[in-house]
């Protein structure tokens, strides 16, 4: 009887329902990361020295940081402006659906669209020719970086707008009405009433945008291949090339460095957000 009660209490425990998920995390995340960590130290610090002294690694890190530094602020700014523009408008539901369409388009189709649009004889150069501007070889010059940023913003703008709108919908109308009664302008309402209320949403969007910025490799790879124009040679290209050449030790060391960088960025943003929230 006691044994039955013991097993019955275990079965009814809420923690039991976490076991399948925790088992999945352990098998497909913790164990592979542990194996990768061991692999990275297979030659002591030799692999880390080789990675940190690799010129291709320096170029990939520089381009990735540049992409993140340009793409995320532009995405946040444009999506917030668009969310403000359509919030509570009669077209809001329709526009929300339109903005989400790029997320439903498969990557292969997106790549085909960009190839047609930015081809030497494509739509972009025809538009430039209409204004008597010379054609640009988009994917073989530094203009490829702009194409990649545009692709990233176009793909991620929709869900970011939806998140901003969801945050705005949670702000009580009474706060905005009280501010307007006190004579606050639209700009002052946005700056002093809306933005402070959207800090949690800002943190969520920034983290999601940061993570999604590392998924743009698919477009860059399918458009320009494993060795693209140097301005869009990202960390993912480097990892892919090392994997192709079976340089697993280097790849493991670089992955550990990247994981540490991700963790530091996430913790820094979280601490900054919590500190501002306290004050």
Language model: regions and residue ranges:
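A structural signal for multi-pass alpha-helical bundles of membrane permease subunits
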Residues: 6-279
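N-terminal hydrophobic targeting signals that begin at the initiator methionine
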Residues: 1-4
């Amino acid at each position: 009887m006691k044994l039955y009660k013991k097993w019955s209490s275990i079965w009814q425990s809420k923690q039991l329902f976490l076991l399948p998920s925790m088992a999945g995390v352990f098998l497909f995340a913790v164990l592979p990361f542990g194996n990768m960590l061991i692999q990275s130290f297979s030659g002591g610090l030799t692999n880390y020295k080789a990675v940190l002294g690799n010129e291709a690694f320096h170029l990939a890190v520089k381009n990735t940081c540049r992409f993140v530094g340009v793409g995320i602020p532009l995405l946040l700014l444009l999506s917030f402006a668009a969310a403000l523009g359509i919030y509570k408008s009669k077209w809001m539901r329709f526009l929300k659906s339109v903005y989400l369409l790029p997320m439903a388009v498969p990557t292969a189709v997106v790549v085909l669209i960009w190839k047609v649009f930015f081809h030497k004889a494509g739509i972009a150069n025809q538009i430039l020719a209409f204004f008597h501007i010379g054609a640009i070889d988009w994917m073989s010059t530094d203009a490829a970086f702009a194409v990649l940023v545009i692709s990233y913003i176009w793909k991620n703008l929709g869900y970011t707008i939806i998140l901003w709108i969801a945050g705005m919908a949670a702000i009580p109308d009474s706060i905005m009405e009280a501010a307007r009664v006190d004579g606050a302008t639209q700009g002052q309402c946005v700056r002093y009433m809306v933005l402070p209320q959207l800090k949690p949403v800002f943190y969520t969007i920034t983290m999601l945008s940061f993570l999604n910025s590392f998924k743009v490799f698919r477009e860059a790879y399918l458009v320009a291949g494993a060795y693209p124009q140097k301005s869009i040679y990202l960390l993912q290209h480097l990892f892919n090339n090392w994997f192709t050449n079976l340089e697993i030790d280097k790849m493991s060391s670089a992955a550990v460095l990247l994981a540490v960088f991700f963790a530091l960025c996430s913790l820094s943003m979280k601490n900054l957000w919590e500190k501002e929230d306290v004050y």
